[in-house]
Amino acid sequence: MQHFEVNYDGLVGPTHNYAGLSFGNVASLANAKATSSPKHAALQGLKKMKALHDMGMKQGVLAPQERPDIFALRRLGFHGTDSEVLYRAATEAPAIFQAVCSASSMWTANAATVSPSADTANGKVHFTPANLTNKFHRSLEPQTSGRILQAMFNNGRYFEHHTHLPDNEHFGDEGAANHTRLCREYGHAGIELFVFGRYAFDSSKPAPKRFPARQTLEASQAIARLHGLSEDNTVYIQQNPDVIDQGVFHNDVIAVGNQNVLFYHEQAFTDTESKLAEIQRKFGEHPLHFIKVATEQVSIQDAVNTYLFNTQLITPPDGQMTIIAPTECQENDNVRSYLEQLTQSADSPIKRVEYFDVKQSMRNGGGPACLRLRVALNDEEIAGANQNCLMSDGLFNRLNQWVEKHYRDELAVDDLRDPALLEESRTALDELTQIMKLGSVYPFQQD
């Protein structure tokens, strides 16, 4: 039996815009109110997916969510026709209105936490959608995320789906952006690392002061229980509160892991040495590489500005571990120099770096790692999943045509109130569910 890590990238939605909604995300705030290009963003994302597919990687696609979220606005007391609801909300509560238009579901690292069958007690792949309670615009996502994931992984023999955690900050969960897995091979039992920002029930513990800690220890522990993980294959690590206050809002902005490699900044965690020792002890006697980037090599500011760690660390079929990095890393002399030294070092397990232009996503604070949800699967599980969500030459061409047909070239924040945009988006998503054989996953399809 063969085993793979499949990257499911989020397809950028038709309302991709720069509203600056994410406090604690430096890039999101810096580009607030700029004009976006939904079409360009979606095509950029598809190009990256196709490139990884062409490298021999298993690559999937995760559908976007329905926006503007008319149903959320109606729950908040805006009545009338859809056009009237849009107008009233945009006029009377513009901040709320912009939030329900967000295309943030494109960052599928926040869609869910996934545990592969090799790690779980019942031998199934487990999915728990993230509740994303810290940001209103993202807290609207988990129910639809759950329906989409169930439509993608729709065979109960292999897959088990859980309801997202309670919608409360005590159980704030940001999904795979605060979770990584170390293993020898993808099909072998691994160590799942849960990184959290604060203790929900103990205010005496360290916590950031400037920006919020979005993930709690208690949420991470709950996910591990739901997924049937054990003490022997889990490690809980607190993120350094000081780096959260410098704009590191998720662990995947300061660390990334793949197979037997953990690539991290020296300021990423609290109690680093004891936690690395715990990882090593639970990993066993097999080779394990901890690649520490010192502050004198790359500053926190450079790490955040270039998203050095919000890169994809992958193992293509040729076995040459590769970093998939945004072009911002290439454009920063210091970071580019570091990556050149890293990949040229004889004792480094990371051998290549490939640069991709994902600037439409980067301007909203999401790099290559934000755009993908990693799912370790064996060939039987892949065969048991929805085949229409796996990248191929045919799907790539079909989705490019779909984007060209339905997406706008430019979108300003003021354009979000246009009733035509809602209809354009619904028409596009209805067609997409047919292309990807998802069924009626969107609220407007169930209305």
From Swiss-Prot:
The active site is at residues 174, 250, 370. Keywords: Arginine metabolism, Hydrolase. It catalyses: N(2)-succinyl-L-arginine + 2 H2O + 2 H(+) = N(2)-succinyl-L-ornithine + 2 NH4(+) + CO2. Its EC number is 3.5.3.23. The keyword Nucleotide-binding does not apply. Pathway: Amino-acid degradation; L-arginine degradation via AST pathway; L-glutamate and succinate from L-arginine: step 2/5. Substrate binds at residues 19-28, 110, 137-138, 214, 252, 364. Pfam families: AstB (PF04996). One of its GO terms (biological process) is arginine catabolic process to succinate. GO terms for molecular function: N-succinylarginine dihydrolase activity. Homodimer. Belongs to the succinylarginine dihydrolase family. Catalyzes the hydrolysis of N(2)-succinylarginine into N(2)-succinylornithine, ammonia and CO(2). This is N-succinylarginine dihydrolase.
